[in-house]
Amino acid sequence: MAMNFVTFNQDYSYLAVATSKGFRIFTTDPFAKSYETKEGNIAIIEMLFSTSLVALILSPRRLQITNTKRQSTICELTFPTTVLAVKLNRKRLVIVLEDQIYLYDIQTMKLLYTIETSPNPNAICALSPSSDNCYLAYPLPQKAPPSSFNPPSHAPPGSTHVSPTTGEVLIFDALKLEAINVIEAHRSPLACITLNSDGTLIATASDKGTIIRVFSVPDGHKLYQFRRGSIPSRIYSMSFNTTSTLLCVSSSTETIHLFKLSHQTSSREGSPSSALSRERAASQSSLGTSPDPDDPTDDMESSEIASRKHNGTLMGMIRRTSQNVGSSFAAKVGGYLPKGVSEMWEPARDFAWIKLPKTNQTAGANGNAGSLRSVVAMSNNTPQVMVVTSDGNFYVFNIDLSKGGEGTLTKQYS
């Protein structure tokens, strides 16, 4: 039996696992099996909070909404191409295909809106759990340049978008069904984005994986930026705690990082949060790694991106509004700093970290293909981090919220 997919529900009280032989649902505190079925090869599973409603992808293009309590099927939908991700909150159901996003009213299952996107094979998309701040975030679609080539009449229509070359995030109001902002998060294409439980913060990481940034939603002010490390790494999972005071990040390395969201670690101050972080920073710099292309000390890129013109388009209007707000904010804060320094601060390091136990899969992993994948979440009731790995292990680590430092493994299940 192979594990195909694993996810926490919106408040991290449940864990859902899709396998080649059905799916399982567990409570996280205490950890215990809540529901199991051994039928079907389930590619993706998503829960709606702690309800009995579950969304399943049974074949590449077929979605089934199931009531686990009644053991009944509510509805089934078939899509034109492979479903790559499913997102739920109490208002909306979001289906992510490689070049489209479908939005449904979750009460009636009526299709409300279809969004054309750039190719998005990694299904980079986030839906706020909040019903009030019901925002959807995804990479800004990039239009394909005009082509003089005329395909034959029998050829299928070509794509109107190309893969993104920068890390810009579009914020879409899923209730009003309109785009409301574009956040210029990174120079490199996005690898991971996540929204907090209130829909007021978004964390972003590029495919470099060295710098994590946090912006306010929907206005797009940059509030925090953190350094995960100096060596590029694939970011697999990011998760805010329910009070949005901590951000947990897992990657293709064996270290999981926790960053503290407080005034002291805002992007304008950016000092390392502990002596331990400074020691680890020094040891990493001694490796002689090259500067990170996504490092904010190279943030002169912001002015280059901002100077691009987007006249006559909705995205251009959104972008100019965002830039005007951001410029006035930066001008006020930057006035207190020497010229040339206000855009060149050192990002804060992690407040705490976790080392995953060595397993057969992690042995020899070097951060490339074949490394251990992980999904992270933080407990609502205790200062604990929950980690699920692709080799089928569930770990619980204790974190010292006053001192930070390395987390302690307290529980393990497989």
Swiss-Prot record:
Free-text note on domains in this protein's UniProt record: The N-terminus might form a beta-propeller domain involved in specific binding to phosphatidylinositol 3,5-bisphosphate (PIP2), leading to the association of the protein to the membrane.
Keywords: Autophagy, Endosome, Membrane, Protein transport, Repeat, Transport, Vacuole, WD repeat
Originating species: Aspergillus terreus (strain NIH 2624 / FGSC A1156)
Any single GO CC term annotated in Swiss-Prot or TrEMBL for this entry: vacuolar membrane
Region (Disordered): 261-314
Protein name stated in the entry: Autophagy-related protein 18
Assembly and oligomerization: Component of the PI(3,5)P2 regulatory complex.
Biased composition (Polar residues): 262-289
Biological process annotations from GO: autophagy; protein transport
Family in the record: Belongs to the WD repeat PROPPIN family.
